[in-house]
Amino acid sequence: MEAADINDDVVHPEVRAHITNLVSALGGYSADDDGSYKLGDEALDVLRDLKKWIRFYDEKTNRMDVARCLAEANLVGGDLLQILTLWPQSETDSKYKARIALACFEVMVPLTWPIEKERAEMTINHHRHMPVLQLAQLGYKRAIINFDAIPILNTAVRVALPSMAMPIGERTPRDQAIIKLILFFLRNVAMIAPPQGVKCEGDETQVSRSATIDAFSYQDIFLTLLTLASNMGEDFRTEDVVIMEIIFHLVKRVDPSSLFVSEKQLNKAKGQELASEMRKEAAMLKSYNKTTTTRHSRFGTMIWVKRADGKMVTVSGQEALLDAKTRERKMDNSKTFRPPRRARKPEMEPKDLGPPVTLDERARQQLRSFVQDFLDSGFNPLFLHVRQSIDREALHALNQHKSQFFYLVAWFLEAERMRRKAKRDESKSTSAAGEEVNSFNLVAAVLQQEMFASMNRALDRSYSDKDWQLLTSVMRCYTQIFLTVQEMSESPNEEDQEIAENTLSRLFYEETTHDLIANIARTYKDQGFEYLDAATELVHTFLRILEGYSKQNVDLQVRSRKRARRKKKAAKAAAAVAAARAAGEEAEDVGVPEDNDADDSGDDEQHAERVTQERKFEFGKFAIRFAPQGVVDTFVAFTKFYRDLNDAQLKRAHRYFYRVAFKLELSIMLFRLDIINLFYNMVQGPEPLDKSSPMFKEWEELSKQIIRKCVKKLQERPALFTELLFSKIGSTTHFLEHGYEKPVTTTTPRPGAELEFKRATERDEQIGIAVSVLIDKQQVEHLQWLKDQLTSAMSERQAWENVDKAMAATTEGAADGEAADERSNKSAPPHITIRPDTEARRTAMFKNPHLRLLMRLVGMERLTPTLDETPDSTWILPGSHTAEAIQDTIDLINKAEFSPPTFEDGGSAEDQLRRKSAAASRRTRAAYDDDEEEIRGFLGDDDDEDFLFAPGGPTARKPDARPQKKRQRKRRREAGSGDEEDEGVSDEVLAARAKKRREKELEKIRKIKSEMYVHASDDETDDERDREFFERERKRQETKDSKFDSMLGALGLSVLSQVNGGEKSAWEAVLDDEPESDESENEGRKNAKRRKKQVASGSEEEQEEEEEEEEEEDSDEELPTKQAKSKTSKRKAAVPSKRPARRPGTAKKRAVVELSDNDEDEDEEEDAMDVDSANERTTRNEAPLPSSPGEGLGRRIDKMAMDDGDEDEDDQPVVAARQRPKARGGFIIDSSDEE
C-alpha cells in the first residue's frame, strides 16, 4: 500500500488508469505452449492512442506523467519489441504488419527522446520524473541493441526503406516524415548514455560505446549511414543534420590516433600509459607518505616554533617534526581564508561530450572501417551540405548542430592525417594509384574559401555571444585545418603543395583573424579545461605555422581594416564631379562633401565603416600580440594541470614560455611569484614532473634559465622586487626592461576645412548662403547660439560707446592741448570674447566648417592667429566692430533665416561653397607671419607684376666700366632741359607716355633669367681677386679722406680724430643740427652699411652687390628738381635753366651740388660724401626699410623708363638747381644765404 500511495502521489490516478488500460488492450503473451506474443484486436488504434497521450498530455502540459506510467508498465521491452518480432524479414508484402511496426516506432521515438531541461525551467514534477526516466531510457537502449529475437535497428531501416527508395521528387510529406522518424530513432539509441552520478542497474558494458558500435555494425546501420551521406544533396536534403548527429554521438571522445594503429602498437601504447600512471601514483604516494599517519599517530604531538621576530607559534601534528620546510607549510595551511560567498559558477565543460571513451578491439576495428569508408565516399557530400544548411540558417539546423559540425570536421581531419601517417609507416613507397585514392581531395569540401568564411563568422559570433562550447569546437576545427594544410605542403605531390600554398595565404590574409585569436587567448577566465586546451593548442599551432610560412614568403601581405568615415552623399558628390569633368569645369569647383568633419554637427550624417588596406606582414611585430599578461596567464592556468597533461600538451606550454622569454625577449612578463613558484614546483617541488618523461629535461632547463634571468634583473632593477607581486602592464614592462618610462606621443587634432564661395558675392549674400547651409543641415541650435553671442556683444559694445561719448562730453571745456593729449591716449574698444556654452559647441567651433565660415563672415577671429588652432582656442569679436555694425549683421542673419536666398540653377546653398585649396590655406597661414604693409609690398600693389629678383643684377666686371656710368649720369643731368619742351604738354599725355615706358621696361624685366644670380662658381674663391679688391678700396678711402679734409678746411672746421672719445665730430654736429637733411643722412647710412658689410665679409661678391644696391638707391633719389631763384648763393650753376614751379605743399626736392666741371672731379667729389670708414663707426640707427619692396621697384622702373625715353633728345647743359638750405654735402650755409 505504501508503494501504491507513493505512485498515486506522483502521477494522477486517472492518468495512470487510462495508460494501464491501453497497455493491457495492446496485447499479451499467449497461454499456448509456445508462449508467443499475441496482438489485441485493436492494437493499431491502441498504439495511436498512446502516441496521442504522449503528445497531447506530456508535451502540451510540460509534464512527464505518461512517460512515467509507460516506463513502469514496461511497454518497450514487454510489448513493443515483442510486436516487432511478428514481422520477420521474410515477410515483405504484409502492409498491416508494416503499419504496426511503424506505429511501434512512433511510440518508441518520444520515449527515447533525450531529456534536456534547463535547471531554471524545471518544475517539481520534472525533478520527480527525470531520474527515473533517464534510467528507463538506459533500459530501453539495453533492450533494443541486445534483443536477440530480431535486429531492432535493422527493422527500423526496413520500415523506412520503401520511402528511401523513392526518387526525391516523388516522395510525399508522409515519406519524408517516416525517413526522419527512423533516423531520429537511430539518433536516440546512439545518444543514450549512462547519466553521470547515477548508479545504473545491470551491466554497463551492454550500453557502452563499444556495444553501440557493434550493434550498428552488425545490423548494417553503418552501411545505411554511408548510403545516405554519399547521396546527400541529390536524393536527400533535410536529413543531413540528423545523420551528422548520429555520427557525432558514435565518434565523440574517441581518440582518432588509436583507430589507425595495429593491435600490437596499441597494446604497447596502453602498457606505456599504464606504466606512466603507476609512476604518477608512486610519486603521489611518496609525497603523501611524508605527512601520512603512522602507527603512533594516535599519540598527540604539539611543538612550539620560535619565529624570526621572537614570537612563539604552536604547531600540532607529528609531521611538524620532519623538517623546517614542513613546519612552515603546516603553519601556512593552518591559516584559513574565508572569502566572500559568491554565486555558484556555472559548469563550463561541454555537457554533450562526456568523459573520454575507450573501445574494445572489435569495436575499434569496426569504427575504423566505417571511418575509412566515410572519408572515401561520404565526407565531402555530407559536410558540404551541412555547411550550406547552417549558412542559410535552415529551419532544421539548430544551434547545437553548429558545434557538432565543427567538432566532426576537426575529428575526421585528424583521422585522415592519422590514416596517412599509418600508411606511411607501413610502406615508405606508395603506388600512384594509392596516392590518387588517398589524396587530400577526399577532404576538399572543408578546405574551400566558403568554409573559411563560415569558420571566421562562427569564431567571431561565438566569441561575441560567449558561446564557449561553439567557440571550443571552432578552435578545434581551425587547429586541424592548419595541421592538414601543413601536411599538404610537405606532400611530394606538387598539386597538393600548390593547394596548401593558396590555402595558407587565404587563412593568413585577414588580420582580423589574427587579432581575434590573440583576444581569445588573452581573455580566458574559468571557461573549463576543454576551452583552455583548445585555445592553447590553436595559439601554438597558429604561431608555429605562421612563423614558418612568413619565412618562406617574405613578401606576405595581410589585409588590415581600420575605422573610416563615409558621407551619406558620397554617391551624389561623385556624380557631381563626373558631370563637372564632362562639362570641362574644374573639379575644385564642385561641391564635394568634406571628409574631415568628425563632429556630430558636421556636414552630413556619418557612420563608421571598415576600410581595408593591404600592408606587409612582419611576424616579429605580430608575435608581440601574444605576449601580454593575459595570454601569459592563460598558459600559466593551462600549465597548472601539468600532472594531468601528456607530453604534447607539456611541449605546447614549454614552447610558448620559451618564445616569450627568449625569442621575444620579454622574460619580464614571467617574473611573477606564482609563475616562478610554478616552474620550481614542476622540477623540484613536492609533486614534480616524472623524471623519466622526455619533457622533464626541457622544463628543467627552461626553469633554470628563467630563474637566472629573474635574479639578474633584480640586481639591475630593484623596483622589480615590488613588481614580482603584480602582473605587468605595458608601461611597467618598458620601464623594467629599459630603465625609463616609455615616451608617449600625442597627435594634435586638425580644425575643420576652410570653405570659400565659388562666385564673388556681396557680404549679405554670403551670410545668407552660410545661414541657409546651417538650416538645411538642421543645425539651427548653432545659428541661435551665434545670434545670442552677437546680441550680447552688441549690448556690451553699445554700453562702451555710451560711456566713451559721456567722457568726451566732460572734456569739451578743457584746453585744446589737454584734449588733444587725452584723445591721443584714448584706447581702442576692447575685444569681446566668444564663449561656447557646451563642449559640443566647442567641438563644433573647431570642427564644423559651415559654422566657422559664418563666424568669420560676421567678423569673429581667433585671439592668437599666429599659433596653431586647438579645440581650446579662444575666438573674439575685435574692437573695430561698432554696435551699429554688429546690429546690421544680426539683421542680415535674421533676414537670411526667414527669407533664404534662391539660386538660378536650382542648386542648394551648399553647392555654392567649395573647399579652399591647399595652396590657399598655406597662403592664409603665411599671412599671419607678416604685417599688412609687408604683405602689400610683397604682392606689389604699385604694379601688376611680381618679380622675384631685381633687373640686371651684380656683375663681375672690373672698375674700368665706371666711366660709362659717369656718362650716363651726365646725360641724365643734361637731359633736364627737355622739360621745357614738355611744359605745353598736358598731364594726360605725360601719364600715357610714362605708362608706355613702364610697360616696355616690364617686358624687359620679364626676360631676365634667374641664372644670372646662380653660377657654379659662386662657391669658389679667388685670392688674387680679393687682394686687388682690398688694394682698390684702400686707395679709394685715402682719396675720400683727403677730399673731405680739404672741404672742411675751406670752411674753417676740423675733424676730430677720436670719434669714440665722447666728443662729436664736426660732421656729426652738422647732421644733428639739421634734422631735415634727409639726403645726407640717407647717403651716410648707405655708405656705413656698405662699408660694414665689406669689412666684415671681405668678399668681392658682396662688395659688388652693395655697389649695385647703392647705384639703384642713387637712381631713386636723384629726381629732377624744380628751378628756384637764389640771390645769395656762394656757388653758381654753369648754365641757368628755367624749371617749372614746385607745387605748394610738397616737400623740398633734393638738389645736386656741382663741385667741378669735369666728370672725374665730379665722381670723386661724390665719393667724398661717404664719411664712414673702417675705423669710424657712428652710433645712429640705420634707416628703416621701405614699407613696401614694390615701391622701390616701381620708382626704379619709372626712372629707367624716363631715361630711356630721353636718350634720343639733344644734350643740354647741366643746370645747377638751388642749393638745399642749411646743409649739403658737408657745407655749412648761413641763414643769410636764403635771402
UniProtKB/Swiss-Prot annotation:
It is found in: Nucleus. InterPro entries: ARM-type_fold, Timeless, Timeless_N. Keywords: Cell cycle, DNA damage, DNA repair, DNA replication inhibitor, Meiosis, Nucleus. Pfam families: TIMELESS. Residues 999-1044, 1193-1202 have a biased composition (Basic and acidic residues). Disulfide bonds: none annotated. The keyword Transport does not apply. Residues 327-357, 584-610, 812-841, 897-1235 are annotated as: Disordered. One of its GO terms (molecular function) is DNA binding. Residues 964-973, 1124-1150 have a biased composition (Basic residues). GO terms for cellular component: replication fork protection complex. The keyword DNA repair applies. Residues 585-603, 929-947, 977-986, 1070-1081, 1099-1118, 1156-1170, 1203-1212 have a biased composition (Acidic residues). It comes from the Eukaryota. Forms a fork protection complex (FPC) with csm-3 and which is required for chromosome segregation during meiosis and DNA damage repair. FPC coordinates leading and lagging strand synthesis and moves with the replication fork. FPC stabilizes replication forks in a configuration that is recognized by replication checkpoint sensors. Belongs to the timeless family. Component of the fork protection complex (FPC) consisting of tof-1 and csm-3. This is Topoisomerase 1-associated factor 1. It comes from Neurospora crassa (strain ATCC 24698 / 74-OR23-1A / CBS 708.71 / DSM 1257 / FGSC 987). The lineage of its organism: Eukaryota, Fungi, Dikarya, Ascomycota, Pezizomycotina. The gene is tof-1.
